[in-house]
Amino acid sequence: MRFTFSNDLGTLFTIILAIGFIINLVLAFIIIFLERNRRTASSTWAWLFVLFVLPLIGFILYLFFGRTVSARKLNKNNGNVLTDFDGLLKQQIESFDKGNYGTDNKQVQKHHDLVRMLLMDQDGFLTENNKVDHFIDGNDLYDQVLKDIKNAKEYIHLEYYTFALDGLGKRILHALEEKLKQGLEVKILYDDVGSKNVKMANFDHFKSLGGEVEAFFASKLPLLNFRMNNRNHRKIIVIDGQLGYVGGFNIGDEYLGLGKLGYWRDTHLRIQGDAVDALQLRFILDWNSQAHRPQFEYDVKYFPKKNGPLGNSPIQIAASGPASDWHQIEYGYTKMIMSAKKSVYLQSPYFIPDNSYINAIKIAAKSGVDVHLMIPCKPDHPLVYWATFSNASDLLSSGVKIYTYENGFIHSKMCLIDDEIVSVGTANMDFRSFELNFEVNAFVYDENLAKDLRVAYEHDITKSKQLTKESYANRPLSVKFKESLAKLVSPIL
């Protein structure tokens, strides 16, 4: 009896392995042939490695983290929202191709090729009537956000990766509910994974007052989200079509420095002016993509005439996501780095880009450009941290100055060149932000803002340690092992 049981068990195990092997062969075929235009070579090899080293587990991981997104499904509900902006983009492209840049701004004229490239995206139209303020502290940011919510007159739209309903989240939700009582339109779009501790039931009172709330790529089954790999990492607020926010801060007490990582250093922009139209457009397209309610159509109230001359900061909003082969933000960063003549200042909590991005940084440094990169000194995601540390260290031999921020956790996503142009937003300098997640950045052609953020960066350096070739060479063997493991799977982190 025992012998029969053993044989049966062995047969069952063999069948399971055979099924797993067949499934992996099918997935390998899909990854190599059917998804070849949606993946980099390094990503393809990394997934093949996972599938064949971990046959059954690899299949499960692929279901959650390996599937790609259909652009057709995402864009099917756009309606007539894009009509006016398609015309504006076409007009600006034609003007730039003729050498007519439509502005006296020196930075736009000097970097017209960057502007022209960013015009290739539906959000990328150039606006000039803008006033920009920046925030590097979460308390200062959300004090201002709450004031702006209180002063809203017609509507408030929020789109966030993380909307934690802790102290800060409850304060913001209460402020929004007060505006609902005054008859305003209020919509919240949060990411289902980034806000994993939030339930739709938490918004029952908000919805009873007339508020609308949706979860991006919401899971249809408890604890099972097969779109876990493609998250909406954007952070956008639009108020009355006049005022917008974009940057790295999520909503939650952690971002006020009250979490386990300590002080939270990030960068966020408050924009008044015509660039708010691009943030509004992005919110509407993302809202419509979820298709669970009546869709937005074009309405002049969402794109109103702005309240007079506000400033002279030219801005382009760049969005990127897995449904497009054109990685707008990555290419924008890369173009900036390759255009730099004097200096490049980079900040990113995760630094796992592809070789072309790393080579652009090396080329800039070896061309005599003063290149700085700042990363965290502590991990919030261990494997990601060690891949970041390894990639950053690879730049040392090219003359790049590497800093680890010691005063808490740095979450800022910033690229700044020559004290002339700065990009701030949600996109980390990694494969996930460049290709897998939905991201949004502002590219600002404003010397004053660029210089202010460079001064803030230099202050950050005083709270950082500079990584040297010597200190990196003397790292412990355990660190070398972690780096090697992390780098092996970094294309799918």
From Swiss-Prot:
Cellular component annotations (GO), alphabetically ordered: plasma membrane
Localization recorded for this chain is: Cell membrane
Which is an annotated Pfam family here? PLDc_N
- Catalytic reactions on record: 2 a 1,2-diacyl-sn-glycero-3-phospho-(1'-sn-glycerol) = a cardiolipin + glycerol
Top-level taxon of origin: Bacteria
Location of the active site: H233, K235, D240, H411, K413, D418
Annotated GO biological process: cardiolipin biosynthetic process
Catalytic activity, EC: 2.7.8.-
Instruction: Specify the protein's topology with respect to the membrane.
Output: Multi-pass membrane protein
Q: Which residues does the UniProt record annotate as the domain PLD phosphodiesterase?
A: 228-255, 406-433
Main location per the UniProt record = membrane
Q: Which residues cross the membrane?
A: 13-33, 45-65
Supply the Gene3D superfamilies for this chain: Endonuclease Chain A (3.30.870.10)
Q: Which InterPro entries match?
A: Cardiolipin_synth_Firmi, Cardiolipin_synthase, CLS_N, PLD-like_dom, PLipase_D/transphosphatidylase
Q: Which cysteines are joined by disulfide bonds?
A: none
Molecular function (GO) terms for this protein are:
cardiolipin synthase activity
Q: Which UniProt keywords apply?
A: Cell membrane, Lipid biosynthesis, Lipid metabolism, Membrane, Phospholipid biosynthesis, Phospholipid metabolism, Repeat, Transferase, Transmembrane, Transmembrane helix
Q: What does the similarity note say?
A: Belongs to the phospholipase D family. Cardiolipin synthase subfamily.
Role of this protein: Catalyzes the reversible phosphatidyl group transfer from one phosphatidylglycerol molecule to another to form cardiolipin (CL) (diphosphatidylglycerol) and glycerol.
- HAMAP family listed in its UniProt record: Cardiolipin_synth_Cls
Q: Which PANTHER family match?
A: CARDIOLIPIN SYNTHASE, PHOSPHOLIPASE D
State the protein's name: Cardiolipin synthase 1
